[in-house]
Each structure stands twice: as structure tokens, then as C-alpha cells.
Regions:
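Catalytic domains that recognize anionic headgroups
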Residues: 1-130
Length: 130
């Protein structure tokens, strides 16, 4: 699995924003990679994980919500903290609304952040639900 904790602005649009941690995040700060690769031998040994990740690949996955549950699922680790409904390698993955964790550790819905019109246009262009 490859992911990141945040996206980054690198002069991507006419606003010329740079880096991250703006008071109001941009699309580029919110767009976070989440890649899963499985070797042929892993796919053969754990076909249920491959089938689930293939079935979930077009879903609007939130990497921050899914990373930990997916790692526990892939590792076969049993714990009361494991939530397979948020594991993209589980057959019953459930989409949750996207949120942004602000500087006060409070989850906020994306449409309540004061983002600019062009940020919502980019989310829609990439088919990212919010």
C-alpha cells in the first residue's frame, strides 16, 4: 500500500498556492494517493482480498479512513479496533462521507470548509464525492 497524509499545492492553478496547511484547503491538498499492489503469489494465496480490492477499486475511497483497517485486514490482525467495513480488501466495504481534519482535530465536511469554486470543480471532474 502506498498513501500519504495529505496532498500538496505546487502552483497547480491561477491561485499559485504552494505546499499545504492553508487555512482553507484546496483540492490539491485534499487529493491523496492510495495505491494497492499485490503480487501474483499473494493473489493466489488470498484471492478474497484480490476480489474485494478489484470490486472496490472504482469506489470513492477515503485513504485516511481506510488505511489502518486495510492494513489490519491484509495482515490478518485481529483486534477490537479493526473495522472491516472500512477495509478496501474486505467484501463489505462501506463508503463514508469525506471529511477534513482541521487544526483542532475536528472532522469537517468538505462543503463546510470555505473552499473555492475551482476546488469543487476539480472534485467533480475527478468524480470525488463529498
Amino acid at each position: 500500500i502506498y498513501t500519504s497524509d495529505h496532498g500538496e499545492d505546487i502552483f497547480d492553478d491561477p491561485r499559485h498556492l504552494f505546499l499545504h496547511a492553508s487555512p482553507v484547503p484546496s483540492y490539491y491538498q485534499l487529493h491523496i494517493p492510495f495505491l494497492i499492489w499485490m503480487s501474483d503469489s499473494y493473489r493466489e494465496t488470498y484471492p478474497e482480498h484480490w476480489e474485494a480490492v478489484t470490486a472496490n477499486k472504482e469506489k470513492n475511497i477515503s485513504s485516511s479512513s481506510s488505511f489502518f483497517p486495510t492494513m489490519l485486514d491484509l495482515g490478518g490482525i485481529k483486534t477490537p479496533y479493526r473495522d472491516d467495513s472500512q477495509s478496501v480488501t474486505a467484501p463489505h466495504y462501506v463508503l463514508k462521507p469525506r471529511v477534513y481534519l482541521n487544526d483542532h482535530n475536528e472532522p469537517r465536511p468538505l462543503d463546510d470548509l470555505g473552499m473555492k469554486k475551482q476546488d469543487f470543480q476539480m472534485l467533480e471532474k475527478r468524480n470525488i464525492k463529498y
